[in-house]
């Protein structure tokens, strides 16, 4: 009693539509292990994103400034296909890829209008990790 359902379309899957966005925001999250670059429009909807891990960097190479630079370039190229020209950069985290990612966004052709550090600072919240002994 197995019948084939011929011509059934997949539900829920939308095609990517090409938006035409001039201004946006680049959110750079730079941790000790990875760098994630997300480019959004002014409302906060994601246009493109990239990270050092998605580009094939593994292990300790994910946390390098070069990996952050490549992630920022990849996200910027994908965002510029949607017509993005100007970004405000919001940097979060203590990682080594912060400055490299900002420079890569500028080198890719995006005009940076604002650079703001939005790293969350606890008012004596959680206990921090223990000191490393190398």
Curated annotation (Swiss-Prot):
Function according to Swiss-Prot or TrEMBL: Located on the platform of the 30S subunit, it bridges several disparate RNA helices of the 16S rRNA. Forms part of the Shine-Dalgarno cleft in the 70S ribosome.
Pfam families linked to this entry: Ribosomal_S11
Molecular function terms from GO: rRNA binding; structural constituent of ribosome
Keyword tags: Ribonucleoprotein, Ribosomal protein, RNA-binding, rRNA-binding
Domain of life: Bacteria
This protein's record includes keyword Ribosomal protein: yes
Protein name per UniProt: Small ribosomal subunit protein uS11
Gene (UniProt): rpsK
GO annotation (BP), single: translation
